[in-house]
Amino acid sequence: MSHIIPYQILGCVNVRLAKFTAGTDVDEYHLTLCIDDKACHMSYAEQLRQLCAAFEIVRQQIKASPVFKRYFISDAANQTAMLMNYELTSPDYELSVIEQPPANGTQVALWCYLMTHINTKANTFGLYEVEHGSYRHLWSANNTAQAKTCSAQTKLLLNDYVMQLMNEGCTLRDNCVRTWFYVNDIDRDYKDMVKARNDVFYTQGMNRHTHFTVSTGIGSRQADNQIRCQMDSYAVCGLRQGQMRYLHAPEYLCPTADGMSFERGACIDYGDRRHVFISGTGSTDRNDDVVSQGDILGQCMRVWQNIEALLNEADCEMNDLQVLTCAIRDASDFHVVRQFLQKKTEHRIPYVLVNAHICKPGRLVEMECIAARKAKSSYPNF
């Protein structure tokens, strides 16, 4: 079951923490740290210092090990080096750094996924492994490739990932749960990225007759201005046939059979719990048309309905959400969207609200999330 740790402020850092426990060995935590509006005047160095100090306080309080961190920063070219000074001494979790500015005008935010009673290590072939029980969870982040076009970079990234998975005894088709593609110029290169992704998928037996992966494709710059695309990923080694299934909500969203090249969501059943991963979700209908064109609040409401429909298909509810990332295309929509999220979450769900270009111009807001629910099945425990 989920336990929401009381919302707190440490220095200038707003802390939101959700704990999930199934009463078995591994407890899970999702933590978001965001700089308070009142600290906008502080330097990046001071915001980062206070955020990292707050993280360490919370980590010691909950006595859990970080598995995956994602920093959202406002200027990757000038801020990444200082951030890495805090992170280079901690090699036992995966680290993602993306330029998606916190939407409240501050300069850095953090989402971190933590667990108890696990073993973590960096594997020889470049993936970070989290091992417990019958499973090995394989995380990868900040992957980039040297090529002239976004399409070529995407193919190189995915082909390299296919080989990394093969070296771990896994495949893209059977073990990859989720990918994130952060595209420098999403308005120009999104279609090329998608086509390149599909080209690699097809070589791995992934198509509209089989399945794709849960995914987010969204705008973000990297510290190196030659990088057109960055890829993060998550896979699970040890899954049995049928243990992961895909979510469609066809009455609300356009299905893969009609041309979508990513899964709207996926759920994985373990012996003691169910995990649900929801792709970046916009305000669209079953024909992939934008709902509430030009209306940010209307689009927020439709996104929420779409996510709820996907969760319901997995026999889950909005109360099962563990963490949510919300991106808005126009920073001036910040106050409306934050008020919407505050009303919907009531501080129950850790979230990060950032400013980023979304894959198609008419889509003003996009949300992705992770949910968990206590459940029993014949599969080994998480």
Predicted regions and their residues:
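N-terminal presequence-like segments and the immediate start of the first folded domain
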Residues: 1-322, 328-382
